[in-house]
Amino acid sequence: MLTSKGYIIQLETLMQQKQAMPGAKELIQAFQMENISYLILTERSSVTVDDILNQLEYCGIHGVKKENIYTSTMAAVEYIVTHDKKAIDVDYIGGKGIRQVLTDTGFHITHHQPQYFFVGMDRNLSYDEYQDVFTQLRKGSQLVSVDNRRIQIVDQVEKIGNGTIVRMLEYASGVKAMNFGCGTKVLLKYAS
């Protein structure tokens, strides 16, 4: 979260496919040299903040600290903790980034009637696993989307994004998702 005036940058504008985008190294270096606050936003749920820092280093974008990274999962958790003091039982699909934020916050991950069901990108799920999510939603779990992307580029190929999966789950279950992906007002509110 930004603690003073500064810049909010989406991770994908700095790095894609483990390569720095043109001008990314120079931009972050200029922020650091001028002591300008910045926050890098991402909806990536498959990786942890440490993984992101390592990827940035690999790309030649040096000196980024943990406090410079803010994920959509962090925003979702912060929102839920602020608005639902009784929230404790959650479940998720997605990667280790979601799991780490949930466990670091003290949520109990359970497959039995979670209050909130977080949905991040997981390209290895089966029909039966989506059926399990659907069942939990029909039993009363609140759907939480941490990645809005309708389409995402993987190895220069367009693939179905997490936002498309969330829309499928909304349609099937009749449960409207709480949405925390990049570009949402709530993500920007909690990031700034």
Regions found by a protein language model. Give the residues of each.
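Asp-based phosphoryl-transfer active-site loop
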Residues: 1-23, 27, 40-42
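Ligand-binding beta-strand-loop-alpha-helix segment within the catalytic cores
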Residues: 76, 84, 90-94, 98-105
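A short, structured active-site edge motif that brings together acidic residues
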Residues: 65-75, 113-115, 148
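Short acidic low-complexity segments
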Residues: 1, 106-115
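Conserved phosphate-binding catalytic cores of ATP/NTP-utilizing and phosphoryl-transfer enzymes
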Residues: 74-85, 190-192
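Short hydrophobic beta-strand segments
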Residues: 6-8, 86-94, 118-119, 145
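Conserved acidic, metal-coordinating active-site core of Asp-based
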Residues: 114-192
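Substrate-recognition element of Asp-dependent hydrolases with the DxDx(T/V) motif
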Residues: 27-56, 69, 89-93, 140-153, ...
